[in-house]
């Protein structure tokens, strides 16, 4: 009996490691093809010039929920307002902060309440008011004040309701966006024949980098082991895993830290699910389900360019909590999604 168990274990380990190796080699090859294709047609300086001069450039709403961020809110909002793109707005959702987050923004950006007909396309906690700056310098800024919903998803849904552009980016208020991130994200949309419902940008660790005025001025590798290995994991995940999935139109997820979405499809799919532990994966799954239900061709694209920098958990305790939440969110999504939407990529489904 012992020999049978030992033999079975050996075969299992051999089979598992072999399949894992084949998987990574296959996706590395697919990623290489995707990178080569992008290199052949994408020249960033030319793309920026074309997008900037075109009268048909689609607008983008950058949505960032904020809860008790009084210490960093001004620097973070200034960083978003400094983005380069011809047509965008920054929507900050004050999710019932109990500190002076809203007061600091009101004073610094000279915010005043404006009349606004709030259309609740996606249900959220009660909307209080909408504020805009009386200073033309901050004309791109919109601040939504609402009751606390307890989750980032609820605040993001309020931002989607207020957004006025056809595409939106959901990010965390403490993330650092690359100056040309919006150009990079919109390029697959304007160059694709199929409808692109979501674009995933590459994220890396900001741990160890030098930050000034809300921008990364010196890229450095993290100095401690845990953020360093997370950085390597992010590079593998985005540049091999997601680039490979993107090549066969089978992207399973667009990160909640930075992703661009088609607003009309997101609203039709019901927006973010507030109780979900992985609202980003849940949204993508339902957007794909919506497109499949109406037999509409679509694409979800991963771009290799770095668009966002985020602070990774610096210790094992915080890393454990983060990964546990991700795992719970994955099982929650798999438990609630219709299995008809989990078919092979050849049927244009995830």
PLM regions and their residue ranges:
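Conserved small/polar residues in nucleotide/adenosyl-binding loops
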Residues: 340-346
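Short aromatic/hydrophobic "clamp" motif used to bind/position activated sugar donors
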Residues: 168
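Cell-envelope/extracellular polymer assembly enzymes that use nucleotide-activated donors
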Residues: 59-61, 89, 282
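The conserved acidic donor/metal-binding loop of glycosyltransferases
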Residues: 172-176
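Short, acidic, metal-binding catalytic loop of nucleotide-sugar glycosyltransferases
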Residues: 78-87, 111-112
